[in-house]
């Protein structure tokens, strides 16, 4: 690191400590040439993630927008804020793990719905009705039927698992 006083390119770290909730590291440095002490800050450079909307426009990923959608769908439902925040965390981590710079809003919605269906089925249906834009009651009915079929299959597996354990 170049010294701001004498512009020598050598310095040593005297002290290092995390700040800002652990996302930034503050380092005290000392120039090897003139002994001048100065502070530097180190943080992870996060590449922006762009969301491709249905109309083709792009906007930066906004986790608060995803959270608002989940909150709206879970309104008056027994879903805690911590659970909703955890869903957003999991979805964001999954997206970032893909290593892509752009992702469709449809895929984000699918990731949210995959988690929400296990948390609260009513919240899931509400969220799906917005993301999948149900055009009529037939499409809505088919979504409900698919969910009920999955529930029956899950219940059947649980019942078979219990009878095999006996």
From Swiss-Prot:
The lineage of its organism: Bacteria, Bacillati, Bacillota, Bacilli, Lactobacillales. Residues 49-139 form the ATP-cone domain. It comes from the Bacteria. Its cofactor is Zn(2+). Keywords: ATP-binding, DNA-binding, Metal-binding, Nucleotide-binding, Repressor, Transcription, Transcription regulation, Zinc, Zinc-finger. HAMAP family: NrdR. Pfam families: ATP-cone, Zn_ribbon_NrdR. GO terms for biological process: negative regulation of DNA-templated transcription. InterPro entries: ATP-cone_dom, NrdR-like_N, RNR_NrdR-like. Belongs to the NrdR family. This is Transcriptional repressor NrdR. Binds 1 zinc ion. Negatively regulates transcription of bacterial ribonucleotide reductase nrd genes and operons by binding to NrdR-boxes. A zinc finger (unnamed) spans 3-34. One of its GO terms (molecular function) is zinc ion binding.
């Amino acid at each position: 690191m170049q010294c701001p006083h004498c512009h020598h390119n050598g310095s040593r770290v005297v002290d290092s400590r995390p700040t800002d909730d652990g996302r930034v590291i503050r380092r005290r440095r000392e120039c090897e040439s003139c002994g001048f002490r100065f502070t530097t800050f180190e943080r992870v450079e996060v590449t922006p993630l762009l969301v491709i909307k249905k109309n083709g426009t792009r906007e930066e990923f906004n986790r608060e927008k995803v959270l608002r959608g989940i909150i709206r769908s879970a309104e008056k439902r027994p879903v805690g804020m911590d659970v909703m925040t955890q869903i957003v965390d999991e979805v964001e981590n999954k997206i970032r793990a893909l290593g892509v710079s752009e992702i469709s809003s449809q895929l984000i919605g699918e990731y949210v719905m995959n988690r929400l269906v296990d948390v609260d089925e009513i919240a899931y249906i509400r969220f799906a009705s917005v993301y999948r834009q149900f055009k009529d009651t037939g499409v809505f009915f088919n979504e409900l039927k698919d969910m009920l079929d999955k529930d029956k299959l899950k219940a059947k597996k649980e019942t078979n698992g219990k009878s095999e354990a006996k």
